[in-house]
């Protein structure tokens, strides 16, 4: 596997570094900044799993650690404020740095703090879940939730580097592994059908090198899309396949019911059903999607939670992808994707949605 992918950004170019030696790669990334202060942002789960790693960080660097509770509740302005307090108390300057080490929540949270503290300080991402490695860490999106609305406050603020190590995945629970596969299937279904087919046939237990290749292929796809449309005006919108409904599910349901990748899987199924109903996607493609989700134990319906189509539709109206009058869905097609604009007052669509859930 190649060791580095270089991402071109209108904000700031950065490298994605693949390694089995996180400490050495981080030291190489820091360069002369080794002498500066570092704040490592992580969550309790990662901190306890890799406490010896954090102890090594403390020995080698002028390092501080901020440990968040696990889960999406940490993507909040209250947590941002707590991290600001620590940065101020330790007298962090614009030349000091944040290092996030955790899943998507930690990366989004730490990146948002980095983007806003002193109007921007450098940061490095070390994603530890499959989902964060192939999706949320790539592309510079950072942000937090606000009043129950997913990723309502945020920015595009690329890191100095992203360090990818599949060794972290050895401690990842199967449910979280499947959530990462969900995002890989998303990009494969829209942009890279050979990747989708490889994921359909992949045997995790016997093919570690195969997993590394699939991760690299997924990241390469997202890199290509982000470089062409960093600010989500066209092509990058395709990566929201499944996300209009998925984000609404996350807003209305407790995290225990549906994790991010699971909510997105349900969203993809509904988007694909809409596409089939409009003659945009062959029924066989929908069936293939359902089969691979079943193989990875990803949900395809809302049976775990009592959520109505009406309540989902109300949340749709606050989605950041929307135009002034329309709710935007991303529908897969036989050759790519298209957008579907639903009027915010179209209550007949609520009935249609209810029939698809």
From Swiss-Prot:
Q: Quick one: which residues bind Zn(2+)? A: 183, 243, 260
Name where it mostly resides: cytoplasm
Per the annotation, how and in what number is the cofactor bound? Binds 1 divalent metal cation per subunit. Can use either Co(2+) or Zn(2+).
Q: Which reaction does it catalyse?
A: 7-phospho-2-dehydro-3-deoxy-D-arabino-heptonate = 3-dehydroquinate + phosphate
InterPro entries the record matches: Dehydroquinate_synthase, DHQ_synth_AroB, DHQ_synth_fam, DHQS/DOIS_N, DHQS_C
Recorded GO molecular functions are:
3-dehydroquinate synthase activity; metal ion binding; nucleotide binding
Q: What is its EC number?
A: 4.2.3.4
At the top level, the lineage of the source is Bacteria
Location within or outside the cell:
Cytoplasm
Q: Which GO terms describe its biological process?
A: amino acid biosynthetic process; aromatic amino acid family biosynthetic process; chorismate biosynthetic process
- Member of which family? Belongs to the sugar phosphate cyclases superfamily. Dehydroquinate synthase family.
Q: What does this protein do?
A: Catalyzes the conversion of 3-deoxy-D-arabino-heptulosonate 7-phosphate (DAHP) to dehydroquinate (DHQ).
Q: What is this protein called?
A: 3-dehydroquinate synthase
Gene designation:
aroB
């Amino acid at each position: 596997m190649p060791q580095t992918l270089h991402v071109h950004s209108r904000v700031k170019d950065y490298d994605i570094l693949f390694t089995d030696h996180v400490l050495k790669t981080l030291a190489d990334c820091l360069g002369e900044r080794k002498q500066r202060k570092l704040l490592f942002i992580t969550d309790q789960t990662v901190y306890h799993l890799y406490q010896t790693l954090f102890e090594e960080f403390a020995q080698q660097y002028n390092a501080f650690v901020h440990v968040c509770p696990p889960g999406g509740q940490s993507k909040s302005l209250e947590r941002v404020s707590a991290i600001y307090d620590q940065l101020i108390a330790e007298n962090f300057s614009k030349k000091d740095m944040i290092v996030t080490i955790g899943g998507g929540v930690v990366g989004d949270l730490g990146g948002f703090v980095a983007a806003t503290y002193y109007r921007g300080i450098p940061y490095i991402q070390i994603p530890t879940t499959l989902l964060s490695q192939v999706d949320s860490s790539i592309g510079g999106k950072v942000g937090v939730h606000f009043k129950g609305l997913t990723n309502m406050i945020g920015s595009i603020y690329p890191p100095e580097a992203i360090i990818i190590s599949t060794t972290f995945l050895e401690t990842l629970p199967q449910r979280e592994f499947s959530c990462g596969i969900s995002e890989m299937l998303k990009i494969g279904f829209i942009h890279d059908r050979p990747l989708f087919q490889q994921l359909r046939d992949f045997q995790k237990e016997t093919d570690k090198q195969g997993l590394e290749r699939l991760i690299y292929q997924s990241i390469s796809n997202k890199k290509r899309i982000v470089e062409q449309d960093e600010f989500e005006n066209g092509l990058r919108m395709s990566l929201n396949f499944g996300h209009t409904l998925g984000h609404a599910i996350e807003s209305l349901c407790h995290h225990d019911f549906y994790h991010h990748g699971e909510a997105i899987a349900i969203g993809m199924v509904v988007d694909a059903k809409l596409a089939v109903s409009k003659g945009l996607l062959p029924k066989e493609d929908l069936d293939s999607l359902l089969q691979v989700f079943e193989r990875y134990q990803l949900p395809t319906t809302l049976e775990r939670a009592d959520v109505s189509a009406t309540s989902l539709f109300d949340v749709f109206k606050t989605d950041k992808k929307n135009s002034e009058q329309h709710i935007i869905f991303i529908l897969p097609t036989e050759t790519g994707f298209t957008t579907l604009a639903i009027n915010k007052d179209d209550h007949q669509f609520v009935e249609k949605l209810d029939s698809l859930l």
